[in-house]
């Protein structure tokens, strides 16, 4: 009996050690000026934001989270009140974040991967664009002028992001992140009705599908691209050939009207004669 007890204990210990030895990523760092506040680790899934873990910060502001290594690049965020820091995870890496309670979402420092450095750059670019758009909305410019300025700002932003982040490295997690940034709650890149934007989604979808063909994000992005391509495809113009005996040449538009006696007359019946047509509208 005692031997069986020892055996069971050993098996349980081995199982617990195996669980602790599973590949995992780590997120750690400090948040200054946030004593007694709750810091949340959240998963940015395809279905929405999912809470993973949380900690109440002490005076030191140190925190440590961990999670199972994803099978393909995935996205998480740290949330303090209504401020968030976005980051990606694609291995057993350790992401180190240093931030302050004020400016938590933009003035943070992140170490651990190129992807997260680039994601921060994109966050700052988007924040700058949002600030310019807010100022434009308060400028008092005529609606037409303000709209033209808005289009110029957004197009300049998109050109910069396309060139430096999406087409430059479509296989990177930050390229995927760039596709889904928002302005005033709306996606900056349009995956459904903009032919040029669909090309950006297609570039990233192709790379993801090659690297992670079974990942949910790969399939979701691929389906989005297919729908966008269908929506933006130029309609094909088909030539219609009519039989020669069905074609009649006419130098005038034929009009069929009734006279005062109710008799029908066709304009072509009066060919060669001088005809005055009077159109009168009655209200």
Regions found by a protein language model. Name each.
Residues 1-30, 281:
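Bacterial Sec-dependent N-terminal signal peptides
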Residues 19-169:
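A non-transmembrane, solvent-exposed segment enriched in polar/low-complexity residues
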Residues 148-149, 187-197:
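Short coil/turn connectors between adjacent alpha-helices in alpha-solenoid helical repeat scaffolds
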Residues 152-159, 194-202:
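Helix-turn-helix repeat elements of alpha-solenoid scaffolds
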Residues 170, 193-196, 213:
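Structural signature of alpha-solenoid helical repeat scaffolds
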Residues 171-187:
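Amphipathic alpha-helical repeat scaffolds of TPR domains
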Residues 198-254, 258, 268-270:
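N-proximal helix/coil linker or "cap" segments that precede and/or mark the start of modular domains
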Residues 263-283:
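Short active-site neighborhood of thiol/selenol oxidoreductases, capturing the structured segment around
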């Amino acid at each position: 009996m005692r031997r069986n007890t020892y055996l069971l204990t050993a098996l349980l210990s081995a199982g617990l050690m195996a669980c602790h030895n599973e590949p995992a990523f780590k997120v750690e760092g400090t948040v200054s000026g946030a004593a007694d506040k709750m810091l949340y680790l959240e998963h940015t899934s395809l279905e929405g934001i999912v809470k993973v873990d949380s900690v109440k910060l002490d005076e030191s502001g140190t925190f440590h989270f961990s999670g199972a290594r994803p099978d393909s690049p995935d996205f998480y965020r740290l949330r303090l009140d209504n401020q968030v820091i976005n980051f990606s995870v694609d291995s057993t890496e350790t992401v180190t974040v240093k931030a302050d309670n004020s400016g938590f979402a933009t003035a943070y420092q992140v170490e651990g991967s190129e992807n997260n450095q680039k994601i921060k750059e994109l966050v700052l670019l988007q924040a700058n664009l949002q600030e310019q758009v807010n100022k434009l909305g308060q400028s008092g410019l005529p609606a037409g002028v303000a709209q033209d300025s808005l289009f110029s700002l957004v197009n300049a932003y998109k050109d910069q992001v396309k060139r430096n982040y999406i087409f430059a490295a479509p296989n990177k997690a930050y390229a995927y992140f760039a596709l889904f940034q928002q302005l005033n709650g709306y996606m900056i890149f349009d995956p459904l009705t903009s032919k040029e934007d669909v090309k950006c989604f297609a570039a990233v979808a192709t790379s993801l599908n090659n690297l992670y063909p079974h990942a949910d994000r790969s399939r979701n992005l691929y389906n989005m691209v297919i729908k966008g391509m269908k929506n933006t495809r130029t309609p094909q113009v088909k030539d219609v050939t009519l039989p020669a005996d069905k074609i009649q040449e006419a130098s005038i538009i034929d009009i069929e009207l009734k006279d005062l006696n109710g008799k029908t007359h066709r304009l072509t019946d009066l060919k060669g004669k001088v005809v005055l047509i009077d159109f009168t509208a009655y209200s």
